[in-house]
Curated annotation (Swiss-Prot):
Annotated localization: Cytoplasm
GO MF term set: ATP binding; ATP hydrolysis activity; four-way junction DNA binding; four-way junction helicase activity
Superkingdom, natural source: Bacteria
Role summary: The RuvA-RuvB-RuvC complex processes Holliday junction (HJ) DNA during genetic recombination and DNA repair, while the RuvA-RuvB complex plays an important role in the rescue of blocked DNA replication forks via replication fork reversal (RFR). RuvA specifically binds to HJ cruciform DNA, conferring on it an open structure. The RuvB hexamer acts as an ATP-dependent pump, pulling dsDNA into and through the RuvAB complex. RuvB forms 2 homohexamers on either side of HJ DNA bound by 1 or 2 RuvA tetramers; 4 subunits per hexamer contact DNA at a time.
Location of the region described as Disordered in the Swiss-Prot/TrEMBL record: 1-21
Catalytic activity, EC: 3.6.4.-
Protein name per UniProt: Holliday junction branch migration complex subunit RuvB
Biological process annotations from GO: DNA recombination; DNA repair
Keyword DNA-binding assigned: yes
Residues reported in the UniProt entry to bind ATP: L23, R24, G65, K68, T69, T70, E131, D132, Y133, R174, Y184, R221
Binding of Mg(2+), residues: T69
GN (gene name): ruvB
Classification via PANTHER family: HOLLIDAY JUNCTION BRANCH MIGRATION COMPLEX SUBUNIT RUVB, PTHR42848
Taxonomic lineage from the root: Bacteria, Pseudomonadati, Pseudomonadota, Alphaproteobacteria, Hyphomicrobiales
Organism: Bartonella bacilliformis (strain ATCC 35685 / KC583 / Herrer 020/F12,63)
Length: 369
């Protein structure tokens, strides 16, 4: 660092190649937030170490970016065992799972992300492996086929899912330690932002950290990403420190508002508000209109909007709340949405025209009326 750059970000900081990995805490005591989950895990880990046994199987449930993978890695470190990682969609056939399980040593941790996307046939093989530490495989085909039992080391399966409802009951019941992770508070995220800035050797003020934290959607991963983008702006502006003004300017340029809503969130809310007069509207129609997969909407967009009280899920579909109308700066219609069908665009799917094109055309016509 040059002497005349001591108080500047410009040229003084090089961010790591993999910032997410470098910022992850290594022990439970360094992990911020999720106090109940952390306290319980500490007890379970200590008990397993005292008994010299493998920890019971663990299932983490919660939206993306809350620390499921990080906690799994910390567990392996605290237990003093090896950590193996994979994801549900990657395990395509029985041989893939057998290779993973037979290479595990005593008390090792195997982490399977997105376990709700595991092939049902593979899931059947996993049952005896979790319960009896045995692998039941069929060798050969036809009349020559035979069943082979392979003994496995006593391991710990740690799985993560964003969709608990998609797990079958037999699989869900085999996890002795289910843990739900919740969105973080602004205070917790502010602490995380300050810690990450310190690791980056980037000076940041209290109000700057608070500004980033309150727009991070309750998610540490998003807080880390926003901090890196704010660092970019501060670098170019040659700011001495990241304060509220720098953070606000950067995040406004990124179209992240003061509650953390991004353009996709606002498009979601505007679609229901403007096209469907506040709802109710079905999730499939929303997915088609936004050109986004249904899973992405249910896993990424809706959890935060539900937590913030912007939308409600009803048997007839999604509706937006008074809070959402106010946030969008719009007035809620006085007539019920159900009786306002005449002003809703014709979204019949019998036409060859995609639903999303019809909705975009409707919004364009309203803009230029």
């Amino acid at each position: 660092m040059h002497k005349n750059e001591n108080n500047r970000l410009l040229g003084s900081v090089s961010l790591p190649d993999d910032p997410d990995r470098s910022l992850r805490p290594q022990v439970l005591d360094d992990f911020i937030g999720q106090e109940a989950a952390r306290a319980n895990l500490k007890i379970f880990i200590e008990a397993a170490k005292t008994r010299h046994e493998a920890l019971d199987h663990v299932l983490f449930v919660g939206p993306p970016g809350l620390g499921k993978t990080t906690l799994s890695q910390i567990m392996a470190k605290e237990l003093g065992v090896n950590f193996r990682s994979t994801s549900g969609p990657v395990i395509a056939k029985a041989g893939d799972l057998a290779a993973l399980l037979t290479n595990l040593e005593e008390r090792d941790v195997l982490f399977i992300d997105e376990i709700h996307r595991l092939n049902p046939a593979i899931e059947e093989i996993l049952y005896p492996a979790m319960e009896d530490y045995q692998l039941d495989l069929i060798i050969g085909e036809g009349p020559a086929a035979r069943s082979v039992k392979i003994d496995l080391a006593k391991f710990t399966l740690v799985a993560a899912t964003t969709r608990l409802g998609l797990l079958t009951t037999p699989l869900r019941d085999r996890f002795g330690i289910p843990i739900r992770l919740n969105f973080y508070t602004i205070e917790e995220l502010e602490y995380i932002v300050k810690r990450n800035a310190r690791l980056f050797s980037v000076p940041i003020s209290d109000d700057g950290a608070h500004e980033i934290a309150r727009r991070a959607r309750g998610t540490p991963r998003i807080a880390g990403r926003l901090l890196r983008r704010v660092c970019d702006f501060a670098l170019v502006k040659q700011a001495k420190t990241i304060d509220r003004e720098i953070a606000d300017t950067a995040l406004s340029r990124l179209e992240v508002d003061h509650l953390g809503l991004d353009p996709l969130d606002r498009n979601y809310l505007m679609l229901i508000a403007d096209v469907f007069l506040g709802g109710p509207v079905g999730i499939e129609t929303i997915a088609a209109a936004l050109s986004e997969p249904r899973d992405a909407i249910e896993d990424i967009i809706e959890p935060y909007l539900l937590q913030q009280g912007f939308i409600q899920r009803t048997p007839r579909g999604r509706i937006i709340t008074e809070k959402a109308w106010a946030h969008l700066g719009l007035r809620a219609p006085t007539q019920p949405a159900a009786s306002a069908t005449l002003s809703t665009p014709d979204l019949s799917t019998s036409s060859d025209v995609p639903v999303s094109s019809l909705i975009q055309k409707h919004l364009w016509e309203k803009d230029y009326d």
